[in-house]
Every structure is written in structure tokens, then in C-alpha cells.
């Protein structure tokens, strides 16, 4: 029996449309603000407002899923995101856009928690790695296609908002034709995010999500700046970023399958070691294409494997809370990593980007090497 059931395929189809909209807005909002001559610090504050919304949305969604179920939570999340999109057209200004980007951030985080939790509840410990790999592939493909759309269509604010909003609403349609059952309904016990973060046997997965946030946040946010400082043109920067993201897409399925077959611990160790090797290779300034490719293939696949590690340590009724904890950990890493790394790069050297990535990866590798035991019969099962 295929793990890609009808509900899973419809869920991923909706996610693809929503990810297209997310990618387009995340690219164009800073450009629209710059066009309105807002100072750089205000553009940064609007971006921070979006990520703050991500944190709030992550914390809220577990309660909504418990009360409304997966389908209605997904509809609500999409409508919140659509409202955050439409609101941008009401008034252009710093405070207005801070508010609407916060709303959009809440909606996006709700979408991610609902989709990830639904996939984890749909799978078992034996196939969850492949389900999460498919999720990440769809996410990165949607991001890539969103960037392609931006380069091919008019980027005027009032031209973009109608069709982006239509994409968001279209993302609701697939789930109207299926129902994703929440297996938490049998349990009335509420599981807190804090208890999941403190769960000793899942700590390596939580730490992995933090490290993944630091690595991906730094690569996404600071790699273009690094390449620019190396004298690479804007068009070539786009090419190298495409190499990085493409490697992440290509690596998802085989690494997810390997994690299901050989265990998360072994695969995580190899991934982290490869991230360190890729970072060192980038510091040598030779063979940038293979160095970026292996860095992308290993770095962009850390998150789903670390998630699968933690989720096999908890019972079925704790999966949603665990997913919230993992997404929260990733978000914190993606906020703190680029900020700290950017300060180091500004005051010392651009090479600190890869030194930082290699350093945090090495610390995580030591954690993984200390834990020689991997539970062969996980708690979570169907």
C-alpha cells in the first residue's frame, strides 16, 4: 500500500499553491517597501513582524487542531494568510504593513503546523521520513517556482495581490474533497509544548531543528550577501542560489528513504558531517559548485530527519504538540542564527558565515556521537 494516499496527495497539492504565494510575497514585500523609500531598519522591522507572527501562529495551532480538526484548521489558516495578503493593498505604510505581515506570519505558521502534523499522524515510524521528505520537496519546489513567477510577471503591488490571493484561496480547494482524521480525538489530555521541549529522549531531534534553523536561515539570508561581496553579479548570485536550493530538493527523497531504512541517528550523523565538509570546502574558495551542492543536499534535509527522530519518541496523541515544539525550535534558530552571524560577518570576515555553520554543526555532531542508542521500536505507532 502506497504511503502517498489520496488525502496526503491532496494536502500536498494545496501546500504547493500556498507555498507559491508565500514565496512571491516574501520576495516582493521588501522590494515594495524599498520602492516607497522606507529606511532599511523599517524594512527589517516589517520582516521581523512576519517572523514574530510565525512564533505566535506556531503556539496557537495545537489548540485549534484539537478544537476544530485538521480540515477546518487548514481552512482557517489559509483565510488568515489571505487576509494578511489583501491587507497590504489597503494602505501602504510602516505600521500598517507591520500589522498585516504579522497576520500573514500567523497564517503561514498555522498552515505549516497543520500540514506537518497531518502528515505525521497519517504515517508511521517506518514511513514518516518519506512523508516529511515529500513535504519538504513540495515546499522547496513551490519556493523555486515562486521565484520564477516573480521574474516573469508584473511585480506592481496591485497587479500581484489579486492573483496571489486567488492562489491562496485555490490552496483550500483540494482539502474540500477529503477529510484528514485527527487521531487525537480519543484523548482528552492536553499536551503542552513545554513538556515536549523537555522530553529527554526527543532532545536530539529538538536540537536538530534548532541547528537546522541556524543553518538554513544563515544560508537563505546571508549567502546572497556573501556571494555579492565575492564580486559575483546579481544574475550569477541567482544561479548559485538555485544550485543550493536544487540540491535541497534532490536530496529530500533519498535521504528520507535512507532514514526510514537505516535509522535517523546514523543518517543525522552523516548529514551533519557532510555539512561540516561543505562549509570547509566553501572556505577554500575552490570547486564552489560541488561544495554548494553537498552543503544544500545535507543542510536542507536536516529538518525533516530531525523531526522524524523526535516524533518516533512520543505517542500518537502527542504528535501535534511535538510538531509545534519542533517548528518553534526551527523558527528560533532561523531568527537567532542569521542575526548573530551577520554581526560577526560585518565586524570580522564574510568567512564567518561558513565558520559559524561548521561550528554549530560540529557541536551537534558531538551530541549525536554521545548518544549511541537508537530506539528500534519507537513509541509512536498506528
From Swiss-Prot:
The chain crosses the membrane at residues 14-34, 45-65, 79-99, 102-122, 131-151, 157-177, 204-224, 236-256, 265-285, 289-309, 325-345, 349-369. It is found in: Cell inner membrane. The keyword Cell inner membrane applies. Its main location: membrane. One of its GO terms (cellular component) is plasma membrane. CDD domains: MFS_YcaD_like. Disulfide bonds: none annotated. Keywords: Cell inner membrane, Cell membrane, Membrane, Transmembrane, Transmembrane helix, Transport. GO terms for molecular function: transmembrane transporter activity. It comes from the Bacteria. It is a multi-pass membrane protein. Belongs to the major facilitator superfamily. YcaD (TC 2.A.1.26) family. This is Uncharacterized MFS-type transporter YcaD. It comes from Escherichia fergusonii (strain ATCC 35469 / DSM 13698 / CCUG 18766 / IAM 14443 / JCM 21226 / LMG 7866 / NBRC 102419 / NCTC 12128 / CDC 0568-73). The gene is ycaD.
Amino acid at each position: 500500500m502506497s504511503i502517498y494516499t489520496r488525502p496526503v496527495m491532496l494536502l500536498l497539492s494545496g501546500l504547493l499553491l500556498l507555498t507559491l504565494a508565500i514565496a512571491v510575497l516574501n520576495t516582493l514585500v521588501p522590494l515594495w517597501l524599498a520602492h516607497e523609500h522606507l529606511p532599511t531598519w523599517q524594512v527589517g522591522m516589517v520582516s521581523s513582524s512576519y517572523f514574530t507572527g510565525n512564533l505566535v501562529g506556531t503556539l496557537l495551532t495545537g489548540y485549534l487542531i484539537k478544537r476544530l480538526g485538521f480540515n477546518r484548521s487548514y481552512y482557517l489558516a489559509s483565510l488568515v494568510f489571505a487576509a494578511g495578503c489583501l491587507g497590504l493593498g489597503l494602505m501602504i505604510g510602516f505600521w500598517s504593513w507591520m500589522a498585516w505581515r504579522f497576520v500573514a506570519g500567523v497564517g503561514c505558521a498555522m498552515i505549516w503546523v497543520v500540514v506537518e502534523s497531518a502528515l505525521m499522524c497519517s504515517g508511521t515510524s517506518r514511513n514518516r521520513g518519506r512523508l516529511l521528505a515529500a513535504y519538504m520537496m513540495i515546499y522547496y519546489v513551490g519556493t523555486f517556482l515562486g521565484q520564477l513567477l516573480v521574474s516573469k510577471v508584473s511585480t506592481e503591488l496591485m497587479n500581484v495581490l489579486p492573483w496571489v490571493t486567488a492562489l491562496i484561496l485555490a490552496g483550500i480547494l483540494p482539502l474540500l474533497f477529503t477529510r484528514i482524521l485527527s487521531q487525537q480525538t480519543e484523548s482528552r489530555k492536553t499536551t503542552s509544548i513545554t513538556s515536549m521541549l523537555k522530553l529527554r529522549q526527543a532532545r536530539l531531534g529538538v536540537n536538530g531543528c534548532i541547528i537546522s534553523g541556524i543553518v538554513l536561515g544563515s544560508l537563505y539570508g546571508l549567502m546572497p550577501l556573501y556571494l555579492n561581496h565575492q564580486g559575483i553579479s546579481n544574475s550569477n548570485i541567482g544561479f548559485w542560489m538555485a544550485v543550493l536550493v536544487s540540491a535541497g530538493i534532490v536530496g529530500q527523497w533519498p535521504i528520507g528513504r535512507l532514514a526510514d531504512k537505516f535509522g535517523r541517528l546514523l543518517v543525522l550523523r552523516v548529514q551533519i558531517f557532510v555539512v561540516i565538509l561543505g562549509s570547509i570546502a566553501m572556505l577554500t574558495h575552490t570547486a564552489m559548485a560541488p561544495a554548494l551542492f553537498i552543503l544544500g543536499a545535507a543542510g536542507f534535509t536536516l529538518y525533516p530527519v530531525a523531526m522524524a527522530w523526535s516524533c518516533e519518541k512520543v505517542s500518537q496523541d502527542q504528535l501535534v504538540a511535538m510538531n509545534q515544539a519542533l517548528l518553534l525550535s526551527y523558527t528560533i534558530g532561523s531568527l537567532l542564527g542569521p542575526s548573530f552571524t551577520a554581526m560577526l560577518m560585518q565586524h570580522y570576515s564574510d568567512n564567518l558565515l561558513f565558520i559559524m555553520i561548521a561550528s554549530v554543526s560540529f557541536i551537534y555532531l558531538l551530541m549525536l556521537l554521545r548518544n549511541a542508542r537508537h530506539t528500534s521500536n519507537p513509541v509512536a505507532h498506528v
